[in-house]
Amino acid sequence: MNIQGKFPNTRLRRNRMKEFSRRLVAENNLSADDLILPLFVCEGNNVEDPIQSMPGVSRYSIDKLLHKVEEAVKLSIPAIAIFPQIETSLKNVEGSLAFDENNLVCRSIKSIKKEFSGIGIICDVALDPFTDHGHDGLVINDKIDNDKTLDILEKQALVQVDAGCDVIAPSDMMDGRVGRIRSVLDNNNFHDTLILSYAAKYASGFYGPFRDAIGSGSKLGKDGKLTYQMDPSNSVEALREVAFDINEGADMVMV
């Protein structure tokens, strides 16, 4: 199975461009350099909202979020990952807020980079926080439309990188999304932006607490995300997904 990418989609130097990414991909070592701090952000001021299904974890307004980022910096954690809880009134069937340059994610990125320019910022690319149905893609005729979703994901990735995101992390599991995102980034001169692909994302009940945290799980329907996330019994398929994403230009992959 060939998992060797090709230039220009694959640029191994991207992983070496900044200190945080060099630390993240250092081999045969286990330290704070291998950690990513996930942070949940919400609207408001002075908000620290405990997530009931994740004991010890809270959602933070941007002002409070900065304190958590400061803690990460002091602990030498190289990167944080941002996940938004979008207010219900701002969601719609297309998840159009996902590519609004003034959305909660973009404002968070700008605030963090202003105070802590050296920490890496990883941003989730998927529509589930922004759609009123909670799916990762556009629902058309009761099906997830893969290719129309890719058009939205491209725009979502661009506004995040424009705001200062260092690593785009597509978690949507649409076919072809890594290649499309790599192309749109390169075409807009973001050659050094990393892509961390959720290469093999399983349709797992363990995502329940995460969906509670971002408020996206209540209207998924009886099949949930089975038509695009993977069957947990399929390990060979996982290797195929990893190979596809590397060939499309992913710099890092995770399961």
State where each predicted segment sits.
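Residues that form generic nucleotide/phosphate-binding pockets
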Residues: L24
